[in-house]
C-alpha cells in the first residue's frame, strides 16, 4: 500500500492537449486536491462547446480566470506558434489569452511560448524545468502555501501578438 499525501499542496496534475485543459480544469474545480498544474499545448478552445446543451467549451476559461474567485494554484503552460488553427479555435491565441488572464489576476504562473507544433516535443524539452519550477520551495512539513505571482513576472508586460506572415501597416 502506498502512503500518498491528501493535501493539494503536495499534489500536481499534468496533461498535454485535451489533457492540458483537463489538468487545469481539475485544479480549477478542486484546488484542495491539486495545486500545481502543467499544461502543454492546452486545448483552451471550443471543442466541447454545445450551445443546445448549454455546455461551455474550454475557450471560456480565460474569462473565468479573470472573473471567478481566485484559486490557489501554480500553473506552468507551454505552447508554440505552429500549434493548431481549426474550426474549434486557435491554440496559440487561446494559450496566450490564458497566460494574460493568469497574469491579470496575479496567479503564480509561467508561460513558455516557442515555435513548436501541436505535440509533445516542447513538453518533453520543458518537463525537467517545469517540474523544478512547479515544485520550487516545496516543504514536506507543510500542507498548504499561498501561491503569489513572481515579482519578476509581475513587472513584465502582458503577452502580445505580432503578425509575421502578412504585411502590416
Regions found by a protein language model. Name each.
Residues 1-169:
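Non-catalytic cap/lid and distal C-terminal segments of serine-dependent acyl enzymes
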Amino acid at each position: 500500500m502506498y502512503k500518498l499525501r491528501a493535501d493539494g499542496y503536495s499534489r500536481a496534475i499534468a496533461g498535454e492537449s485535451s489533457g492540458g485543459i483537463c489538468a487545469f480544469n481539475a485544479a480549477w474545480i478542486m484546488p484542495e486536491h491539486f495545486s500545481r498544474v502543467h499544461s502543454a499545448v492546452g486545448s483552451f478552445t471550443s471543442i466541447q462547446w454545445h450551445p443546445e446543451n448549454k455546455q461551455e467549451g474550454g475557450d471560456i476559461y480565460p474569462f473565468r480566470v479573470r472573473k471567478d474567485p481566485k484559486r490557489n494554484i501554480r500553473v506552468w503552460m507551454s505552447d508554440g506558434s505552429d500549434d493548431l488553427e481549426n474550426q474549434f479555435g486557435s491554440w496559440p491565441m487561446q494559450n496566450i489569452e490564458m497566460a494574460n488572464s493568469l497574469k491579470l489576476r496575479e496567479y503564480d504562473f509561467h508561460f513558455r511560448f516557442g515555435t513548436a507544433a501541436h505535440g509533445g516535443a516542447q513538453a518533453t524539452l520543458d518537463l525537467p524545468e517545469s517540474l523544478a519550477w512547479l515544485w520550487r520551495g516545496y516543504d514536506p512539513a507543510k500542507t498548504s502555501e499561498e501561491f503569489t505571482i513572481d515579482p519578476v513576472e509581475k513587472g513584465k508586460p502582458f503577452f502580445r501578438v505580432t503578425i509575421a506572415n502578412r504585411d502590416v501597416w
